[in-house]
């Protein structure tokens, strides 16, 4: 509707669900009086900041496809699901550690160069595809993370994963720059990893690629789009044992 002014909403203090997508909003301050708000969608506006006055019951926000450049000023204590997809965010530093309830964070299609700043111990799903991430930093705080999407980034090394990420089950690294299996071996620190996507990395063109990954990561249940077959697993175990004996 090409709205630029939502000051009228200040009167409707009991609103729970508000969708203001596809307008021309630059200012959300009138929403600060909506203290009962549970759900807010403001996709496709002209917002340059996600900063808002703290709303005590707000659980879901989508700021997708705006012009937001940082993650400061998001402090809603019950926020569980936050989408900032398709903005211009360059760093997660400034993300409030007071987001105690945040489970899902969507940041696809931004300009992140690092994973530093995601100090969110309750986070379960983190979507970072289509950024410019070159380095993995600060992941040790993500102890409850189960899903991590890093597709279409610029990773050449896999330093940064650590054993404190004891719940991570699904990792998507498709279309990065992982060129050798020594980097894949660094994923051995992830005790619960079950599904891994490595398609469109240089290492996926190596001969016996699937076998080499399974030798390094014997607990995988799915590699790329296919489940790990029993005979594949047996062959990988056999080669691993032979190599271990040769090293002795």
Please describe what each predicted stretch is:
Residues 11-14, 31-37, 54-58, 74-79, ...:
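Leucine-rich repeat
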Residues 73, 91-94, 113, 134, ...:
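Leucine-rich repeat domain C-terminal region
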Residues 3-9, 25-31, 47-53, 68-74, ...:
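The feature encodes a structural signal of leucine-rich repeats
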Residues 14-16, 21-27, 33-36, 43-46, ...:
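Generic hydrophobic, aliphatic-rich segments that mediate packing or membrane embedding
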Residues 15-20, 37-42, 59-63, 80-84, ...:
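Conserved hydrophobic beta-strand positions in leucine-rich repeat
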Residues 1-26, 38, 79, 120:
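LRR N-terminal entry segment and analogous cap-like coil->beta motifs
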Residues 1, 23, 45, 66, ...:
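Consensus "Asn ladder" position of solenoid repeat domains
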